[in-house]
UniProtKB/Swiss-Prot annotation:
Disulfide pairings: none
InterPro entries: Ribosomal_uS7, Ribosomal_uS7_bac/org-type, Ribosomal_uS7_CS, Ribosomal_uS7_dom, Ribosomal_uS7_dom_sf
One GO molecular-function entry: structural constituent of ribosome
Protein name, as recorded: Small ribosomal subunit protein uS7c
PANTHER family attached to this UniProt entry: RIBOSOMAL PROTEIN S7
A biological-process GO annotation: translation
Quaternary state and interactors: Part of the 30S ribosomal subunit.
Annotated function: One of the primary rRNA binding proteins, it binds directly to 16S rRNA where it nucleates assembly of the head domain of the 30S subunit.
GO cellular component: chloroplast; small ribosomal subunit
Location in or out of the cell: Plastid, Chloroplast
Amino acid sequence: MSRRSKSKRVLAQPDPIYNSRLVNLLVIRVLKSGKKSVAQKIVYTALEIIAEKTNENPILLLEKAVTNVTPQVEVKARRVGGSTYQVPIEIRAYRGTNISLKWLIEFARERSGRGMASKLANEIIDAAKNAGGSIRRKEQTHKMAEANKAFAHFRY
């Protein structure tokens, strides 16, 4: 990384089928061992399942789920004078989106059932309804930040 100037962030390309950056970010997060075609198949099938189950636009439902799961604050460990404090820090929009996608996929993988596509579809539907594991993780993160509010002056 150059020391002279800050490197520019490269935005994700829009998805070829749905023409959505969010879908492409989701595909990248599902990706394992560089098999992008497999990841795309999983995500597209999940979006089709969402459309069948809810009779709504799957992209709008995905956006709603990501918005519901996105945390506003997170805690970071900060060492001050021999002890470590959990310091609450506000999250920028891009990082918030990445965290929410990561949580959606993490809790979809933990679900019971057959096929990653159906598990991902169910997790997205639950997140859009403000339920599911990813929503619990968001609430847990917010609770942690609220409990450590006293250390907010140790910001980075």
